[in-house]
Amino acid sequence: MKGCDVMPNWTHNKIICKKSIAEKLLTPVEDTYVLDFNKLIPMPNELDLTCGAIEDMSVACYYYSLDDNERKKVKDLLFNTKTDFYHNYWNKYSNDINRLLNGSLNINEISNNYDSSDDKMKEKYSSIYDLGKRYVDNIKDYGFPNWYDWRIENWGTKWNVDDEVSVIDIDKNNYEIRFDTAWSLPYGIMLKFSELCKDNEFHWEFQNEDFDGYHTLTKENGKIIDNVTGYDEEYTDDEIEI
């Protein structure tokens, strides 16, 4: 499983586009640029929550605090909301929920540990129950509990680019934009960006760190075409540099 804290392989991306189109993706900052995927597909602020153990435990605590009627509503929501790897969110959270229900986890100890921690989320969520409710509400409102799950589905990668971008002024009309993304081509971002371009304006190249060829994406009759060249299992690092 490719988790939120796992160090990824990188995908190297290069876009060549008109400067007027690049402005939809880039933000000038002093003498450089920031590339923010939120300009194309904004992530709701409520999803800016930690993923991992604190998520699982806080959802379990919130569920534990509810009466039987509310528990059923939450269980139905979690069970009917699909997610990769676990298939649905009930499968993801049910282990900790069951450990609370059978007494192998102590709810008061967990709550006190959260209260005495320096977790940054305490600034917004004063108790572990409030935090768990936020995760559940996010699933209800957005289909995902946290930034990681939402970005993987909507952007196609887990991290933003920000200032880790190179912008080359090719000529008076065009930029070359280079940046890396975690694990894969940011597929959702690529598709959204392609909507800004006419067929002859769209040009996106990418290479995966585990090298499966040089990919050049173009647009023909509104459809994205992936042209792959240079695939060779016996590659070296200098052969995969864009």
List each model region and its residues:
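Long, contiguous binding/interaction regions
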Residues: G3-I242
